[in-house]
């Protein structure tokens, strides 16, 4: 009758519900060996289950809001590029930067800052 049916990818479910965050060094957007290993496990799961991903880049509180927005985006883009190299389609991976706006730890310590220098996969 002229209607359209648009199929949407199902969100990742099952064991992929807990995708791993990856962490970065200070002022870095380069993936560490640990980050690459975590992303390889995540990519395998997503390939098996299907679905779309959103990569959220985050930073610690140091630096300007503008600088950290750009750094968070570089982190998200680095993750997307690596996942693409593992066979995930770029069209199925969205990226966003939250800069320093979504800390998971708020203490002014190196240990806390390290927890905030991350990319979360959703």
Predicted feature residues:
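Periplasmic peptidoglycan-binding/tethering modules of Gram-negative envelope proteins
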Residues: 1-53
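Periplasmic OmpA-like peptidoglycan-binding domain that tethers envelope proteins to the cell wall
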Residues: 58-122
């Amino acid at each position: 009758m002229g209607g359209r049916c648009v199929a949407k990818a199902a969100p990742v479910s099952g064991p992929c519900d807990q995708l791993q965050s990856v962490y970065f060094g200070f002022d870095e957007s380069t993936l560490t060996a640990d980050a690459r290993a975590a992303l390889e496990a995540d990519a395998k799961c997503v390939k098996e289950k299907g679905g779309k991903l959103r990569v959220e880049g985050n930073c610690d509180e140091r630096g300007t809001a503008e600088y950290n927005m750009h750094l968070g985006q570089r982190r998200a883009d680095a993750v997307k590029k690596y996942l693409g190299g593992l066979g995930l389609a770029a069209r199925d991976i969205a990226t966003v930067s939250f800069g320093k706006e979504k800390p998971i730890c708020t203490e002014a310590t190196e240990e806390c800052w390290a927890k905030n220098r991350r990319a979360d996969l959703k």
